[in-house]
Curated annotation (Swiss-Prot):
<feature type="binding site">
    <location>
        <begin position="34"/>
        <end position="40"/>
    </location>
    <ligand>
        <name>GTP</name>
    </ligand>
</feature>
<comment type="subunit">
    <text>(Microbial infection) Interacts with Singapore grouper iridoviral proteins VP69 (ORF69) and VP101 (ORF101).</text>
</comment>
<dbReference type="InterPro" id="IPR001806">
    <property type="entry name" value="Small_GTPase"/>
</dbReference>
<keyword id="KW-0442">Lipid degradation</keyword>
<dbReference type="Pfam" id="PF00071">
    <property type="entry name" value="Ras"/>
</dbReference>
<dbReference type="InterPro" id="IPR027417">
    <property type="entry name" value="P-loop_NTPase"/>
</dbReference>
<feature type="modified residue" description="Cysteine methyl ester">
    <location>
        <position position="207"/>
    </location>
</feature>
<feature type="binding site">
    <location>
        <begin position="15"/>
        <end position="22"/>
    </location>
    <ligand>
        <name>GTP</name>
    </ligand>
</feature>
<comment type="similarity">
    <text>Belongs to the small GTPase superfamily. Rab family.</text>
</comment>
<keyword id="KW-0547">Nucleotide-binding</keyword>
<feature type="lipid moiety-binding region" description="S-geranylgeranyl cysteine">
    <location>
        <position position="207"/>
    </location>
</feature>
<keyword id="KW-0449">Lipoprotein</keyword>
<dbReference type="GO" id="GO:0005525">
    <property type="term" value="F:GTP binding"/>
</dbReference>
<comment type="function">
    <text>Key regulator in endo-lysosomal trafficking. Governs early-to-late endosomal maturation, microtubule minus-end as well as plus-end directed endosomal migration and positioning, and endosome-lysosome transport through different protein-protein interaction cascades. Plays important roles in microbial pathogen infection and survival, as well as in participating in the life cycle of viruses.</text>
</comment>
<dbReference type="GO" id="GO:0045022">
    <property type="term" value="P:early endosome to late endosome transport"/>
</dbReference>
<dbReference type="InterPro" id="IPR005225">
    <property type="entry name" value="Small_GTP-bd"/>
</dbReference>
<dbReference type="GO" id="GO:0010008">
    <property type="term" value="C:endosome membrane"/>
</dbReference>
Amino acid sequence: MTSRKKVLLKVIILGDSGVGKTSLMNQYVNKKFSNQYKATIGADFLTKEVMVDDRLVTMQIWDTAGQERFQSLGVAFYRGADCCVLVFDVTAPNTFKTLDSWRDEFLIQASPRDPENFPFVVLGNKIDLENRQVTTKRAQAWCQSKNNIPYFETSAKEAINVEQAFQTIARNALKQETEVELYNEFPEPIKLDRNERAKPSAETCSC
């Protein structure tokens, strides 16, 4: 039986400060929730081994700062990502409105080979709170308008839909990683012009 090489999937979590990016990551990886998280400075990551369709993969989940002054740190962190998770707070409409700019910024900084089909997943977090402002319908409509991005409503505090969301994230990231590997292994062939190939060698003679 041939041993398959280990797969490392790089996942980036983006969204405004305070939407729960760190809480979601810690709930998924460590099954813990805390109200005491400080704002992330720069970026931090956690890893978790998961089974995706009978394949063991290591997810490297990057939690980036949501403050605007840290957005310029993006390039190094975004490059090589296999999936991007966009998070907003369902009780804070402004965090939903900025999803467009987070998505655009990621595509500019990460420069994926196929931006149209790059896998995103959107999480509407804090559904355990009562003062909801962004409806499910509104969030789903936005996701559909962006090439049908998968959408999950989550609560990092109550561990609602966190596991399911990250299963989809892992599956989509693995698909992206596999496609990139195939592309690198079999790049597009260089097409020679028919006339170029048919040129007689006599043409190069200077006599």
